[in-house]
Amino acid sequence: MTATSERITVSMSEGVADVRLVRVDKMNALDAPMFNALVDTAERLRTEKGLRAVVLSGEGRAFCAGLDMGRFAAMNDGTSDLRDLAKRTHGLANHSQQAVWGWRQLPVPVIAAVHGVAFGGGFQLAIGADMRFLAPDTRMSVTEIKWGLVPDMAGTPILARLVRDDILRDLAFTGRIFSAQEAMSYGLATRICDDPRTEALAAAREIAGKNPDAIRGIKRMLNGLGGDPGPALLAESVEQMKVMGTPNQIEAVRANIEKRAPKFADGSN
């Protein structure tokens, strides 16, 4: 399989799919075409004959900077498309969740090669992989609270399996930026390496040389641990719908755009 779009390129070699985000001018930020490309690419790879492993990376200065700023501007001026996030369009997930969850559903291991920044949705995309190889200068953040939102894109059920509960709460409540070294200490980084893509491709080729039936069986077993993720995915959507478009959420966006401290009313939910 070789595929090229305005957002993602895919090349196959020796059973390894090299998937790259290529919206370089926007640090691979997530707009509607990028969401669609992530969902569609994962779906096509699920049935790719001979697939043994996947490496997911970003071209340019960053892995993925998160949600496109144009979407936050739409929240500010009231033109945001507030769809019914609770609608399950892809099994357990809605469309934006599937951009991450689809990589969890692949029957083969996925390695994220991360450099630069992985913020918000970009962070969720990274943790949607089975393993994460980080460059030493990588910075990460659960950024949603900065914009008055709750973590989404399947981040909460995945994070709950990866880190301690208090670490999860710290990152989600504060939205603070943390380093590759901190990510390693939290259990969010598999390796820290100078050239994460090269090392990830080497690891993927090593995996591709193992019994593919056993590899797929291992992933099925590990994905089955921890219970049904469906309720957590739905709760994530419901809570997001409660805050999107509210005065406090719009104030968070405006304050960030205007580079000032927000002025929130007392919480109502």
Language-model-derived ranges and their functions:
Residues 98-107, 113, 119-173, 186, ...:
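CoA-thioester-processing core
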Residues 175-182:
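Acidic, divalent-metal-coordinating active-site segment for phosphoryl/phosphodiester hydrolysis
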